[in-house]
Amino acid sequence: MSDGVRRAGQKAVCGLVNLVFPDECRVCNEPLREVSRIPVCSRCLKEPEPLQAEFFCVTCRAPFVSRYPLDETGRCALCRLGLNGFDAVYSFGTYDGTLRKLIHLFKFQGVRPLQKVFGGFLAQVLPREQRFDAIVPMPLHWRRRWQRGFNQSDLLAREIARRWGVPVRRVARRLRSTPPQAGLTSAQRRKNVQGAFQAKARLDGMRILLVDDVLTTGATAGACARALKRAGAAHVSLLALARRDRRDRWLNVEDEAWPRTA
């Protein structure tokens, strides 16, 4: 074997090792001191914390800085008007900082072993006394799934199912690809996803846990939840890994259906 071929082989092996076992944390860029299938240091994996706020909607668990948007029963305007579509929401953290970077590694860079870490996060916020008959992952349109190679919500659903002993049922179907939701109001988002989902089987009387990775306004998840209810589901809860923090954003009254001030 010539020296050139040997050097090329060594370079290829080193490149493969660095790819599989990178020497820097992909979140903080600090040197990795342990060999792991997850290219993230233990400190960054432990950094995300459950969402905290002074006030929450009792139904969708949206965080607020004051009681102003909540009625006497503790519900926000969207839940009071039945615009969310689901019966309860459980979410782990805020979609920013380290948690956002971890989700990007999982979702866009294919670091699938993170699903076990995320399963631990979700287990912290899902009440053990709740009973579910099936866990349903939020479906991707087939083109998006083909491009990404996997459905991140499906991986999260499988991890929760493994921990809870509840079956995964892939009964939600995305009928059409929807335009990007970024920059749209909640009302526009709801219109954007109207009729985008369908249930593939009857769910009469079932309590469903719908699993998604990130909750923004809830328009997409709400549309899917309504499709499951049209198929007979008695109760649909949403479990999300992260939600965008909207506490300091006072929303447009007409678009968001918040109560007007006197």
What do these predicted regions represent?
Residues 1-212, 216-262:
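Glycine-rich phosphate/pyrophosphate-handling loop used in enzymes and phosphotransfer proteins
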